[in-house]
Amino acid sequence: MDDFIHVVEIIYKGNSCYVPELYSDVRATFNPRRNSGLAFCDTALFVAYAKGRCVGRVAGIINHRANKRWNVSCVRFGYLEFIDNFLVAEALMEAVEQWGRDNGMNMIQGPMGITDFDKEGMLVDGFEYKGSAIDIYNHPYYPTFMEAMNYRKAVDWLQMQVSVPQNIPEKYTRAARYVRERTGLHVKKMTREEMKGEYGLRVFHLLNECYGHLFGFTPFTEEQMREFIKKFIFLADPEMIPVVEDTKGNIIGVAVTMHSLTDALQRTHGRLFPLGWWHLLKALKWKRSNHVDMLLIAVRPDYQGQGVNALFFDDLISIYQKRGIKRAETGPTLEENIMALSQWKPFNPQIIKRRRCYNL
């Protein structure tokens, strides 16, 4: 397991755009006591060696719940890393392909993870931009090698960068006021205690409802929900996570945003100790980035297109302005999800990254 985790130190040495995952998180991902998703997934970890040193890795994942939901016999590959050597990449992919066949699978797809909150999608455009806490960064030769192995595009995700306006656009101020007055919808900010309790679970049930139709999605179990809440409660800033409720307290939508942890994670070098935790704490509490990651926006299907986003933007822009935030980067969004992509149009978005799920 140590070689599987630490090989990235060789592959990305000197790369200023690479953002490491915390090594403790990688270990937890493949620990059944820490990841309840392994109850319905089979996994196999493969490591490549050349001249006595580790030069690549890949994880094979068979998500039985996802396969049943989408009626496929698919093995996923994830955590794929390799040096600039085609034979290494080919050997890794052949290993996970054979493992899939040995377990009755007839297709392979990735990069994908065990859950839908794991990083997914190989970067195919935007290599000059830094990675983030929620996405994969890889070298430009990765997609070249994948295509040479006859892997083809399944779907692409896009990420955009927008500048935070100096003033809240009148369009959103007007729309937010109209929605509040005519529908009774309003913005609520969760407390940390609410996040840890039943309210936090209700937010995850909303995500299951909103994202159920998206590529490869598998609904979260309540055990997974509790694990995610426990993991991310330390990182969460309630003021930057607006929830929209109706007059009866039903959750209609949620937006999850946070100050970027990119620079702090780079300073950790993947390690919480001895000083990694301090870099993260500073980035969360005192020395916050002027760049925000907009992790997700979810609106209940029957309320989409009814001005809920105006409530989010009206609320968040004022907070961003107070905190001196200059720009925001969206999370990966399927290129076919036109409604989600179009919500950024008033902010003159710039597409900065494209990432791809391959299949064979």
Model features per residue range: what roles?
Residues Q109, Q161, V243-E245, V256, ...:
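Short beta-strand segments
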Residues I114-D116, P165-N167, E193, S260-T262, ...:
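Short, solvent-exposed loop/turn segments at secondary-structure junctions
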Residues I136-F215:
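Acyltransferase donor/substrate-recognition loop-hinge adjacent to the catalytic core
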Residues V8-K51, G56-R69, K189-A298:
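A conserved beta-strand-loop-helix scaffold within acyl/acetyltransferase catalytic domains
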Residues N67-N150, T268-P346:
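Acyl-donor binding region in acyl/amide transferases
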